[in-house]
């Protein structure tokens, strides 16, 4: 039977050899950033929610509706629209509006969706901001 100090040293050695989860996640994220970008997604995930084409038309017209409130977006990005209720920020970050634009499915909806997603990447793609807070 091994002594207690030998077991402690063995456990310590294992712990040191295995990086903490937070460090592993950072290392994996860093490796992903250094890797090449895929040309296309291998598999497209099925949508969890089906969007509403009527709400998609409202978005293209410049109005975003969530939680029973309407927010004027105009021709600007959804990310620059002033939010009157703090609860709306979580709705905006959830990107359910993207499902509505997909349900509409026309060229205007596609252009708007691409522009807003690109704007989100520019603003929050570094891993900081309201979309990253749990």
Where do the protein language model's features map onto the residues?
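Extreme N-terminal leader/anchor segments
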Residues: 1-74
């Amino acid at each position: 039977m091994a002594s207690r100090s030998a077991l402690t040293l063995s456990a310590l050695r294992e712990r040191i050899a295995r990086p903490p989860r937070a460090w592993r996640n950072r290392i994996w994220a860093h490796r992903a950033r250094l890797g090449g970008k895929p040309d296309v997604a291998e598999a497209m995930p099925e949508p969890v929610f089906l969007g509403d084409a009527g709400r998609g038309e409202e978005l293209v017209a410049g109005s975003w509706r969530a939680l029973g409130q309407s927010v004027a977006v105009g021709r600007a990005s959804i990310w620059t629209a002033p939010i009157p209720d703090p609860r709306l920020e979580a709705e905006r970050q959830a990107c359910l509006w993207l499902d509505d634009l997909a349900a509409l499915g026309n060229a205007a909806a596609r252009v708007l969706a691409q522009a807003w997603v690109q704007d989100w990447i520019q603003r929050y793609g570094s891993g900081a901001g309201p979309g990253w807070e749990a």
